[in-house]
Regions:
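The feature captures the beta-strand-to-loop junction immediately N-terminal to the Walker
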Residues: 44-46
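Conserved ABC ATPase "signature" region
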Residues: 97, 109-126, 145
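H-loop/switch region of ABC-family ATPase nucleotide-binding domains
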Residues: 190-191
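ABC ATPase "signature
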Residues: 214-215
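Conserved catalytic segment of ABC-fold P-loop ATPases
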Residues: 198-205
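ABC ATPase nucleotide-binding domain signature region
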Residues: 40, 52-100
Length: 228
């Protein structure tokens, strides 16, 4: 097994202001996790458990408040989540080009992917309109197509398969299944057990910012379902 990501004693807290009183919310606490290259890992837990925060730390969007995050040198990573990663004044096509260049492609290589990305999104003329004019569903289509078709080494999916119309959700899941090569690492947050079962061979259950269980998909999902 080749290690792709390693989180050691990772903690994260956010400032809160409730009723005029300042305080803190502990999103993650001393979390330790290793992800190997090629892992298909599902993250489950209730709302506010820390799943989305964890993905953002993995992606480098948030620096951890404590602990360390290591990523294997040379591996590209992308987080697909509603509203993240787009420059609103650029068009969909320009955002796709920028994403490809930021992942290390030359401009010529990046341009060679733009038609396929545009066709997958089914955005039509809106592909060449500013992203600030997009609905959340249109942003989702663009983000998913860009992350998937650029062959990112580590793909982080935050409920991205649960939005959009049913036709696009089916198309996205089928495309993702075809892209699940041996070396591609996928970390998926999803509330639907069938999506987790279909894609993931390992599941991590997070509760109140800590790992409650880590193991075989069926076993962890069963334990989670039986929890009070």
């Amino acid at each position: 097994m080749t290690l792709a990501l390693k989180l050691t004693n990772v903690g994260m807290r956010f400032a809160m202001n409730s009723g005029g009183e300042k305080g803190h919310f502990q999103a993650l606490s001393e979390l330790n996790l290793e992800v190997n290259r090629g892992d298909k890992l599902g993250l489950i837990g209730g709302n506010g458990a820390g799943k989305s925060t964890l993905l953002r730390i993995m992606a480098g969007i948030y620096p951890p408040g404590s602990g360390t995050v290591w990523r294997a040198p040379g591996l590209s990573i992308a987080l697909l989540s509603l509203g993240l990663g787009f420059k609103n004044d650029l068009t969909g096509r320009e955002n796709a080009l920028l994403a490809a260049v930021l992942q290390g492609m030359t401009k010529a290589e990046a341009k060679s992917h733009l038609q396929a990305i545009g066709e997958f999104t089914e955005l039509g003329r809106f592909y060449d309109e500013p992203v600030k004019s997009y609905s959340s569903g249109m942003r989702t289509r663009l983000g998913f197509a860009t992350g998937l078709l650029l062959d990112t080494d580590i793909l982080l999916l935050d409920e991205i398969l649960a939005v959009g119309d049913q036709s696009f959700r089916n198309k996205a899941r089928e495309a993702l299944s075809q892209k699940l090569t041996k070396d591609r690492t996928v970390i998926l947050v999803h509330h639907a057990e069938n999506a987790i079962q279909e894609i993931c061979s390992r599941v991590v259950w997070i509760e109140q910012g800590t790992i409650k269980a880590d193991g075989d998909t069926a076993e962890v999902l069963e334990a989670y379902a039986k929890a009070p």
